[in-house]
Amino acid sequence: SPGLREIADIIRLGRTTYRKIVVWTINKIVKTFSIVYFVAASTLLLGIPILTPTHMILMLFLYDFVTLSISIDVLRPSERPERWNMRKLVAISTMLGVVKLTELFAALYIAKLINLSYPQLQSFMFHILLLSGLLNILNFREAGMFWNSRPSNYMLLAITIDGIVATTLVWRGIIIPALPLYAIALAFIYVIAVTLLVTDVAKIAVYRLFGRA
């Protein structure tokens, strides 16, 4: 009946909104691990800043567009009622944050292996951090593998534009030191292989351990 259909629509909207809040929360906590903890730990490890203030400002500015697109993303609502469990949500986000830290330190090790200069190493890690952060949302918006559901056009557009802008900056050396093409290609290959596959597998393993967030 029309009345029941309206009630079902309201329930579906509420569950979809809940999923968006969960995705935003996980993304926020993992981003804290990726930016704050990684930058602090790597700077202490190397004895020199891994990112310049310019890198940080650019990264935070470009992240905002994709983060805002979560609010208009098309997410599948849960088939069952969901309950807010902050402790479980933080545990899941922390586990995924540790995974991201491991991936980023592996990228830093690769950057050292290919003998980039110090300014180039900073731009390389900026590129890795930004691309990884953009693609993370594709991981976190879906409980299964990232390709199980399609993001909204706005989210795809924001990710694409941010990726193009960041790549143009490191390729042409605009505002920040330029990277050789082989380093840019390596960053793309690493991020796609690690963020879209390794992180996704880790996410599913964490969900099996703790239950879906």
Short names for language-model regions:
Residues 116, 120-213:
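C-terminal transmembrane module of polytopic membrane proteins
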Residues 1-145, 169-172:
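Membrane-embedded transport module
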